[in-house]
């Protein structure tokens, strides 16, 4: 023990990096010398014994060099201790909340939101300008493939303006109406928004809808006209539409708005100064009890559920003990960080910031992360008022999904479950079909949402599914005052079976806003009238643009109304809609029968005006995909006991008279009668074999 000479026998100072038993003394004993002390969420045992900065632990002499302390877990930061900050965090910590700006980009689909976001990230140095960094915030393969934004994504930026650093938080939102819930949640973390308009297309349907959503939330709007470099661009017309439609203070000479080309980078440098000058900074008290809002969440295989949060009051650090005001569940914070643009751990999140946090041990169930929930420190529940939260999006389209091969059921079940963990707007329950076997009934926000889910399943998991025709929920009002919501068409009651017990049927309607050039207005009105729509208003603005509003049944939307609008207007019409409640309607259940046996996979609730058209379409199309049998196959479309349409598949012909002499008519007649009786008996007891591929081809649009 000569190396310890002069020390007291009770303890020794552990600074012996050369001793083999203490192979990582800096990591084990000095919280200040470990750069990763804030990102080790797995061992919470030292939280009750935080060490001061640059502390030297004194350990008993007899254990020195025994190897026992190699297993001591790394100390984690708590709200009582400090940890070394990176250069990035030191720069962030020096920025007061008055120089924070939280904003989002809202626009109609394909008006250039993601491209503008890329230019802003490049301008602030958050990403480098390269071809690999296109659509950097569109992280899903389906987003890059389709060129649309499906999931709202966030990013923190640092920007130098007039000699001072500003902390900017950007949210790139979806433009399609199916993902409206993503846009609404994004508003909760923002103080303003860039209202983006395509200079060649002008104000579109979803521009109108997004404006009123943002206006209702009290967001400050900064008008931006994009794509000014296109040959068809007309910025003056776009500015006039912004002024006339929304009463924004913009002029045709461009004052009051920012004219840019996000693709070419023209005038993009003027956007962020406009954000700083016009959008107000957030407010918050770092010394008040923690009050944070859960904006979004996703599932991580290693960390469990990761939360995207907006901090309103207080400061949250790794090691803090927090509680959910919605569920009462208690957690220990394991890691906090920002999206820059990828997850970047930090030692703290402060008021006004938007970032992510995970727990240690991790939150295991995505259902425990309730969007709109409020979290605070344990013990502060009584003094912190919860936020009202968000309205849960309601599925508008339901489909039955089945594996193309029943042997793949379990693998497909795992893939669907994993996707629904990160897309909570999808509802899922088990289903069974006599024709297609075991499957699921899935609920989606719209037809595009359903299509995107199917693409993600194929791209991310290599799995394919067979989907039935989309259906909307219907409501049955009983005479005893009760009501039932039907999402599975096979469960829709038949009037003949429940005669006198049903008061009426109801279907969901939407308030649709359609923007279209005036020259196509007549076609659009006819299409809406044919879809059982009721016109509510019509407004002409500008030289050529018209906005018409209709009350339309949701059934029209799943019947490819969007595609029909595009076809009737040569691609110029745009559609936006919102839920408009239930309306009484004449509804019936249309079944497809094969030899008088209903095929449960092909069943739909329709309006009485559509029964004949759809029934004839079904029997004609299904006949093309059913193989001939040894007996006659009758395909029928029926409502209750009433047959709407019929097609017949003739049996294979076997010449039983081939070996007979031509002069023996009685024998010929006898054999033909016997064959006829045999086919009749076979038809009565035989089952029609319909391959899965036949159903798949029939169900394809």
Curated annotation (Swiss-Prot):
Official protein name in the record: Translation factor GUF1, mitochondrial
UniProt biased composition (Low complexity): 23-50
Region entry Disordered, spans: 23-85
Binding site for GTP: 107-114, 172-176, 226-229
EC identifiers of the protein: 3.6.5.-
Localization per record: Mitochondrion inner membrane
A single MF term (Gene Ontology): GTPase activity
Record-annotated tr-type G domain positions: 98-283
InterPro entries linked to this entry: EF-4, EFG_III/V, EFG_V-like, EFTu-like_2, G_TR_CS, LepA_C_sf, LepA_CTD, LepA_IV
GO CC annotations on file: mitochondrial inner membrane; mitochondrial matrix
CDD domains named among the record's database cross-references: EF4_II, LepA, lepA_C
Class in the EC hierarchy, top level: hydrolase
A single GO BP: positive regulation of translation
Family: Belongs to the TRAFAC class translation factor GTPase superfamily. Classic translation factor GTPase family. LepA subfamily.
Role according to the record: Promotes mitochondrial protein synthesis. May act as a fidelity factor of the translation reaction, by catalyzing a one-codon backward translocation of tRNAs on improperly translocated ribosomes. Binds to mitochondrial ribosomes in a GTP-dependent manner.
One Pfam family, short name: GTP_EFTU_D2
